[in-house]
Amino acid sequence: MSISLLLEMASSTDPDRTAIVAGDLRLTTGELSELADGGAGLVAASGAAHVAYVGAGGAMLPLLLFASARAGVPVTPLNYRLSADGLRALIARLPDPIVVVDDEYREAVGDGFRVIGSAEFLAQARNAEPAAEFPDPDSVGVVLFTSGTTSAPKAVELTHNNLTSYITGTVEFASAEPGDAALICVPPYHIAGVSAALSNLYAGRKMVYLTQFDAREWVRLVETENVTSATVVPTMLDRIVTVLDEQGATLPTLRTLAYGGSKVALPLVRKALELLPGVGFVNAYGLTETSSTIAVLTPDDHRVALGSDDASVAKRLGSVGQPVPSIEVQIRAEDGTVLGAGETGELFVRGEQVSGRYTGIGSVLDDEGWFPTKDVATLDEHGYLYIGGRSDDTIIRGGENIAPAEIEDVLVEHPHVRDCAVVGPEDPEWGQIIVAVVVPAAGTDPQPEDLRDFVRAQLRGSRTPDRVVFRDELPTNATGKVLRRDLVSELSSAAKEPA
């Protein structure tokens, strides 16, 4: 099944339903379908083998997803926040592309590629000779570059079948109520942005786009557009909670708030649940290579865990929930042995929505179709999945493997800690040492030794940070993932400076 069919189903069922609200632009499903046909005609006439998009999103993302599909070529939304050199390097890795670019990023793209402005593409699509085909479901529909927080960005190839398997396996067609609206503020170059466009269109929800995130504007849009569902990343949730606390807003129309993209501190989750008791919170865990979500902590899971006196149940608030029905999971030891409940190892996943294929590398699935996520994980006896961070982040201190997440989960519970990251810069004596980078809570002045004592009291002595340093903010990417390499580089450089 191709993603073209998702739009065909939506537009033929209710062509007059509002599909997109992006600033002053409003499009019905019928209008989106017509523009996609015209956009496909533009792409086909250009002779391009690939469509690249450099921009903040809004209506352009769903339009280019479907226009590219109907032209029979893949599309790649790119990170518009990259440097000009970084952006051009990624475009150069795409085969014979046409680059659709928002005006403010035109200079960054440069003159070395075939380029058309987003506004011009939209205008020409209204009158272009249409083209519409349903591509081979096994052909590549979307290529996304990984964030590159631990290595150089890889180009993940997602087929139409990968994407539609995720949508049809997790969303019921036309299941939304007539007044339902989804607020989308995740970046277009992230898998969450792609899946939000496809899943909300398929469900029948109006999509309200906020292309430049601002917490006050987010709250305003929820209230004025009667938003019923939204998806945010941890840094966004933190800012939204701050605004809600200041304003006392209750957001009565909001029924579901999904969060994901990176680990969320439990005190923040508890605060959000306290401020919005009528909202169903969803923790969604997935990867680019899995076409989005593969495990979900449901609203009921949140409520039960928050209100439970049973430590084993309350602990679930820190999990990513249970795998979705279409996904199989295994936890494996380093030697490939499949581990049992409660044992920690690398997470492997399998399912129709799982790609595991990279441009220039090929498939990394094993002979039985399992994908190595590189995430350290544990599956408990009730099927709840706990993610302990990336295997690449593991600190090896004096020959002992230490998961940063274990220490971070303790530190963030200290009342004087708003956020933290634990990293392992190299050390001539220990191989690596444990350094906790802490963002203090507002109005507090935490002392390094107090925080070290706090960790030591709850974990083994070998888990106690060797050093504690303070920062106003942690460096993160657009989805809230901490840029650990930047922290390690900064700490290593500081260690080399003369006293």
Describe the residue ranges of each PLM region.
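Conserved ATP/PPi-binding loop(s) of AMP-dependent carboxylate-activating enzymes
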Residues: 319-326, 334-368, 402
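AMP-binding/adenylate-forming catalytic core of the ANL superfamily
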Residues: 82, 230, 351, 356-357, ...
